[in-house]
Amino acid sequence: MSDMKKSTVAVIDYGMGNLHSVAKALEHVADENTSILVTSDPAVIDAADRVLLPGVGAIRDCIGEMHNAGLVPSIRKAMAEKPFLAICVGIQSLMSHSEENGGVDCLNHFQGNALFFGEKHTDHDGSKLKVPHMGWNQVKHTINHPLWANIPDNARFYFVHSFYVVPENKSEVAGTCDYGLEFCVALARDNVFAVQFHPEKSHKDGLQLYKNFLNWDGKP
Amino acid sequence: MGLAKRIIPCLDVDNGRVVKGVQFVDIRDAGDPVEVAKRYNEQGADEITFLDITASSDDRETTVHMVEAIASQVFIPLTVGGGIRTCEDIRRMLNAGADKVGINTAAVFNPEFVREAAQRFGSQCIVVAIDAKKVSAEGEPDKWEIFTHGGRKPTGLDAVEWAKKMVEYGAGEILLTSMDRDGTKNGFDLGVTRAISEAVHVPVIASGGVGNLDHLVDGVIEGKADAVLAASIFHFGEYSIQEAKQRMTDAGIEMRL
């Protein structure tokens, strides 16, 4: 069988564990010519047709492990040239800086910061809101994008996070959510898309987003 | 418009089969965990909790395989509890595809374990399970205590204070079970649910005692729970998840439909 038509998706493994559900969800929607490779090998990432950057754990460890494993050049290269999707802490790692762990400099692909909701977070009417923001919330599309294809506006996705991103360039915001404040949950620029929620835990709409990613040519 | 309250069916799994629950003497078989999980996923469950109640540790391997099987087919969050005592136990379950782990007795005997686990794996995946029983007499101010061993052994720990301490140590969520109510079908203990939900900033899952759909509504509205967990009302087809969500929506609760 020829390898010519084979497509590969690199799921970046930087040693923080639990990429099982991301890989399984991608496999679930992938066709027989698409291989899902969970990898920490820069060469595999460089050779892949598309790249997914998951996020697990706290930001300091995340960024630290990316550097330790020598993955940052490959991540930057992928973001410069092919369809790239970051999820959860992955979106935060693409910002300039995060407030988590006393302040951590991140990859600065999107200018702006990841901020803490705060332990005394409140709703618009002043009532107490729990932090982390955990559960199913509605995602409003702020732009049309191939990754939103066949996903209804305001569909619910599964979130679990205590920090949220605030990009400087509002035109990069692709989706928002409301939790005491309206905040950015999806960012898009060129061939890079990033989401705060977990598509692999978001039932059919989450799987649809992964399917869209596998079909995406990297054009906005 | 905002965050939805969650319905979490719980699978109590003994020797590879879903059973009715620890508190029941006449354990009824409710099927294969993977099939049951798939059914709830299709019905629109917001998460699934898998509680391993197998007595012997030999069967842990079976649990790992089941978690793997569920996680490959069910794309909603999965919490695994029962017998989680070490960071190695947590790592195995997360690698098998669990999103969160429930720590119960081990937290009581070694609270530092919760801190260690939260630092290593992140608070988002650490659920501390609390089994509480009311210990105040009629007419006294309400007081609940933590019990272990299926509600048989008192610990002297105040439930509300313990919940606060666990959150301080890094718990990302509290699964609160009333041992007075578990298995009774008389509804949640709304007093302890509300007391703990108001005392901590992390989400609280109410558990123990659900006998009908109004109990789920009460858990959220009066108990201030962020999520409600039930087992037997769903297992034997008494109610579907959709029916439960519809009842909660009709009561004005925001749900994912």
UniProtKB/Swiss-Prot annotation, chain B:
Q: Tell me the route in metabolism or biology where this protein functions.
A: Amino-acid biosynthesis; L-histidine biosynthesis; L-histidine from 5-phospho-alpha-D-ribose 1-diphosphate: step 5/9
Going by the entry's taxonomy, the superkingdom of the source organism is recorded as Bacteria
One Gene Ontology BP term is:
L-histidine biosynthetic process
EC numbers on record: 4.3.2.10
Where is the protein found, in the record's own terms? Cytoplasm
Q: Any idea which UniProt keywords this protein has?
A: Amino-acid biosynthesis, Cytoplasm, Histidine biosynthesis, Lyase
Catalysed reactions, as listed in the record: 5-[(5-phospho-1-deoxy-D-ribulos-1-ylimino)methylamino]-1-(5-phospho-beta-D-ribosyl)imidazole-4-carboxamide + L-glutamine = D-erythro-1-(imidazol-4-yl)glycerol 3-phosphate + 5-amino-1-(5-phospho-beta-D-ribosyl)imidazole-4-carboxamide + L-glutamate + H(+)
CDD domains cross-referenced by the UniProt entry: HisF
Catalytic-site annotation from UniProt: D12, D131
Record's GO cellular component terms: cytoplasm
State one Pfam family annotation.
Answer: His_biosynth
- Keyword Ligase (UniProt): no
Q: One GO molecular function term? A: imidazoleglycerol-phosphate synthase activity
According to its UniProt record, this protein's enzyme class is lyase
The record's function comment reads: IGPS catalyzes the conversion of PRFAR and glutamine to IGP, AICAR and glutamate. The HisF subunit catalyzes the cyclization activity that produces IGP and AICAR from PRFAR using the ammonia provided by the HisH subunit.
Q: Which family does it belong to?
A: Belongs to the HisA/HisF family.
Describe the subunit structure: Heterodimer of HisH and HisF.
Q: What is this protein called?
A: Imidazole glycerol phosphate synthase subunit HisF
Task: Say which species the protein is native to.
Answer: Marinomonas sp. (strain MWYL1)
Give the organism's phylogenetic lineage: Bacteria, Pseudomonadati, Pseudomonadota, Gammaproteobacteria, Oceanospirillales
Gene of this entry: hisF
